[in-house]
């Protein structure tokens, strides 16, 4: 897989001679993934500015603009997306992570209405329980991403379908099964298909969102009374198999793991459980830091500090629940201040930078 990625979707301006050690600001820039408006970019686009000036590490594409309440935010046709992604990647000094939520079924940013191939939901694949079928559909999905130049799929969902009335998981057909073994098998098939096409994947939503009764996009979500350790099994098995490229945290509150903070801000959950107990040393990506589960309870600076202390490597600001063209310089300023004042060590920043470089196949 490594060779494919180096010459494929993450290829960029790789210098012939080893580059000098990056400046702190450049390392911090790699720890951010940001959304933006527009189906095309130019010299005046803030996202191009941040890729060039601030060494922004990743972007995330959306088909629908939540704030404006209209479609066509970044995606209108295959030709348009391919051109957009090429322009974004061309601006990057370090290969850019271009990400999208293309799970399949209801959660697919590249839709048939815009000329993309149809996709199949996790729930349908799990219900059929045919690994060859899952592999076939996943390969077709990954081929679409590859053709667009999109190198990171924010999928598969490995939440268990434990609550059939879950408004954000089961009700949207986003989970393979309530059985962790079925989830694991199909997730591994899904991942293998992506790797065949040089596309990275993201397990989500750690440590488990399947039992929730509420949507963390909208506010506080507590799974303390419904979560079980069975929800960790897919993560444990996929990590053990060496197939976990990146893992996305959930903004769920679980007092059995941390009595004070939701998973994204919880050192006990990420550093303790995910890295310590489950042995994951890859990239941890936050769910969108602009979701109400975070913004309604924590200030911008506190949320960033707690996420970094918890072990998050890439902070996602989708810019789709609220829109801020200065989000990258604002976040960099906060993190630099945390380092300058000794709250966060530069060694901690280096940890994330090294993981991100490994993910991009540069270390």
What are these regions (language model features)?
Residues 339-363:
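Mid-to-C-terminal alpha-helical segments outside catalytic/metal-binding sites
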Residues 17-112, 315-316, 358:
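N-terminal hydrophobic targeting/anchoring segments and the immediately downstream early-domain regions
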Residues 38, 65, 102-106, 158-159, ...:
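Active-site-proximal loop/turn and secondary-structure-junction residues that shape catalytic pockets
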Residues 129-150, 306-309:
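Alpha-helical scaffold segments that flank or form the walls of functional sites
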Residues 106, 112, 121-122, 139-226:
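Surface-exposed loop and adjacent secondary-structure segments within mature catalytic domains
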Residues 117-125, 253:
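Transmembrane beta-barrel architecture of outer-membrane proteins
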Residues 42-46, 50, 59, 71-91, ...:
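Second-shell residues forming the walls of enzyme active-site clefts
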Residues 2-13:
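Bacterial N-terminal signal peptides
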